């Protein structure tokens, strides 16, 4: 098992890592919409989603993968009315 870390995504805020490479798959931790350069969180759900996905992209690229390699995602939203956006 290899720990994956990039400065292009927010650091883990608990006792975990951004991702681990298990050899035949990479598992990422949950990502939040924090801009790793500024520490800011956008107020709009669309921008929050974009930032969270950019964070995932940065982590998997650090592991040598692309978004085309992602086989499963789970999305959590605070307000289901925002889901369609």
For every predicted segment, state its role.
Residues 1-85:
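Short, polar/acidic, helix-capping and beta-turn segments at strand->helix junctions
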């Amino acid at each position: 098992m290899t720990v994956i870390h990039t400065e292009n995504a927010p650091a883990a805020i608990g006792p975990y890592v951004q991702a681990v490479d298990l050899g035949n798959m990479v598992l990422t931790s949950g990502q939040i919409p924090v801009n790793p350069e500024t520490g800011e969180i956008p107020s709009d759900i669309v921008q929050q989603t974009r930032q969270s996905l950019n964070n995932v992209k940065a982590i998997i690229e650090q592991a040598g993968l692309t978004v085309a390699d992602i086989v499963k995602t789970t999305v959590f939203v605070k307000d289901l009315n925002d889901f369609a956006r």
